[in-house]
Regions:
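Leucine-rich repeat
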Residues: 2-578
């Protein structure tokens, strides 16, 4: 979700200065206030319906009058009144129309689809969990329909330890024979005793419930802090492998440290070696995320994957390079590859011995981060994925990351989205000769996200590509040669299709200059996104700098963490033919 900056008031008027987030908050508050003031809903008689329809018509007329008034120049005080009145009238009209609608006359199959849409459209998981209960409290008919729809209950979040997992058990029972999407999560907010993480015995009790329907599990996500419950999980998956016929997605996250188990609290006598995943019986699994844990890679059958996500593993506990290459070669439909502080073991002779890149024709997204830049260079070099649409580079270790971009130049001509976190490019002519050709090699790029970087990166976009299209062009040009290049054809603009950038922890003056210079180069941005954390941390002077730019309405947006920007959503929709 992204909201426009400096909203004047919550308003649905479409005048370009409203905030989507503020309007939603206003609407929710106003509608709850109105609903609480109304009597319990009932079936209306003909005369009552006629009166309500007249009231709806009056509200439509009033809404139209408010909208026309807002289109005329009016004083600020009157504008505030009209916006607030308009919002209230829209809320009242919505409630009237909802109460008039004969919902219980709809066929059961349509009601079921509406219930599912409502539950699966919630902003966060806890809200969706409670909403399913709320549906059963409205009336007998809704309760009957909801309880007998197994699909409505098949997504279960085992996080109710304070309730003895009674809620999860109820969902588990109501899911019947439906395929199951399960999440086991341990965090300090949900624990019986704060500061006391889940134990091996706790995990055993949960798995005793789940494995009753092991042949129905389609997705399993586990988030715990310590090794013991994960060792129990891996052992149970190992022993139950023959019944996990429908398991397609598995995520295992160990949030605590250390990376290796040791000490008296870690029973190595029972787990002397890393375990395989599901005893190697993982033919249907296509989505794997392993965070803070490693496997017996050679005995784990990791093939036919669409998503491979490895995080936080010591360099010597990842898969061997040969095994990793086999995993990639056996996954021709791989769409997302993420290596975050984890990856294959880089052989000592990796630079002397050539490794032909693995062809990944359907790979769309690549993420590399939290390791030495030399590792990133090696990993980028062992794949050939010309159809990648999105690349993320974050927190790479090293003083200068330019050589990584040299390796990537020409490899990703279809790239549309680029995210750079704390990428370091040492300023100088030599690195300019690396970075400009890299940018020229991604001419279709539409969106760039940058965080925690020096503004020098933005300066690269002002360069005329004609001075870097050939390596034999000297870095220090004589005046005659420079004039000859300038006289030869039109300027080559860097990333001419770039539509938007998102910035975080970047000098605001450089950002403003970038926006104005793109406009001067006749390739203006459509949007500037500012990350919420950066927006909240802006000084009054920085805020004033933005406000004095007099940007077009809807140009500057504040983005919410962990959400795609509107342009990213639009790009992915186009990529997938939506």
């Amino acid at each position: 979700m992204a909201s426009q900056m400096n909203p004047e008031l919550p308003s649905p008027t479409g005048n370009g200065r409203s905030s989507a987030a503020s309007w939603e908050q206003f609407e929710q508050s106003k509608m709850l206030e109105l609903i609480r003031s109304l009597p319990e809903p009932k079936a209306y008689h003909h005369e009552e319906l006629s009166a309500i329809r007249r009231q709806a018509a009056e509200l439509r007329t009033r809404i139209s009058q408010y909208q026309h008034a807002l289109q005329r120049p009016i004083q600020h005080e009157n504008k505030h009144y009209h916006i607030t009145a308009l919002g209230g009238a829209i809320c009242r009209l919505k409630i009237i129309l909802w109460r008039m609608f004969p919902f219980n006359n709809l066929p059961v199959e349509i009601v079921v689809n509406i219930f599912r849409f409502a539950v699966w459209s919630t902003i966060n998981s806890p809200e969706g969990i409670l909403l399913r209960f709320h549906l059963t409290w409205v009336c007998r008919r809704w309760r009957h329909i909801a309880i007998h729809d197994q699909t409505l209950w098949n997504t279960i979040w085992f996080k109710d330890v304070k309730l003895g997992y009674q809620r999860s058990k109820l969902y588990f029972e109501r899911a019947g024979t439906a395929t199951l999407d399960l999440r086991i999560e341990d965090d300090d907010n949900s624990r019986l005793i704060p500061g006391q993480p889940m134990t091996a015995d706790d995990m055993t009790r949960i798995l005793d419930i789940l494995m009753i329907k092991s042949n129905q599990i389609r997705m399993l996500i586990v988030v715990v802090e310590l090794w013991p419950p994960l060792l129990v999980l891996l052992d149970r998956l190992h022993r139950s492998s023959r019944t996990l016929h429908q398991l397609e997605r598995i995520e295992i996250h160990r949030t605590g440290r250390p990376y290796r188990w040791d000490g008296p609290d870690y029973p190595l006598c029972d787990y002397e070696h890393a375990l395989s995943l599901c005893n190697g019986q993982t033919q249907r699994i296509n989505y794997i995320c392993l965070n803070g844990i490693h496997l017996d890679w050679n005995r784990s059958c990791l093939t036919n994957l669409t998503n491979l996500d490895l995080r936080r593993m010591p360099p010597d506990l990842g898969p061997s390079l040969d095994r990793f290459r086999y995993m990639l070669e056996s996954s021709p439909n791989l769409r997302k590859l993420s290596l975050d502080g984890a990856g294959p073991i880089v052989p000592m002779d990796s630079y002397a011995r050539p490794y032909p890149p693995v062809f990944l024709p359907r790979l769309e997204s690549l993420a590399l981060g939290d390791f030495l830049v030399t590792y990133a260079i090696f990993y980028a070099g062992i794949i050939h994925a010309p159809n990648i649409r999105e690349i993320t580079l974050l927190n790479l270790v090293g003083e200068d990351h330019a050589q990584l971009f040299k390796v990537m130049t020409g490899k990703f001509p279809e790239l549309l989205m680029l995210t750079l976190f704390s990428v370091k490019i040492r300023k100088g002519l030599e690195n300019g000769r690396i970075m400009v050709p890299w940018l020229l090699s991604i001419p279709k790029i539409k969106f760039i996200r940058m965080a925690g970087m020096e503004p020098d990166m933005l300066d690269l976009f002002y360069v005329d590509g004609r001075f870097h299209i050939r390596n034999d062009i000297p870095l220090n040009l004589a005046t005659e040669m420079k004039q000859a290049i300038l006289a030869n054809g039109s300027p080559i603009t860097i990333c001419p299709e770039l539509e938007a950038i998102e910035v975080q922890q970047i000098d605001i003056n450089s950002v403003v200059r970038f926006v104005s210079d793109r406009k001067r180069l006749e390739v203006p941005l459509r949007n500037l996104y500012i990350h919420l954390n950066s927006f909240n941390a802006m000084t009054p002077d920085e805020t004033a700098i933005l406000q004095t730019q007099k940007y077009e309405p809807n140009f500057v947006y504040v983005t919410v963490p962990m959400r795609l920007t509107p342009i990213e959503e639009s790009i992915w929709k186009q990529v997938r033919g939506g």
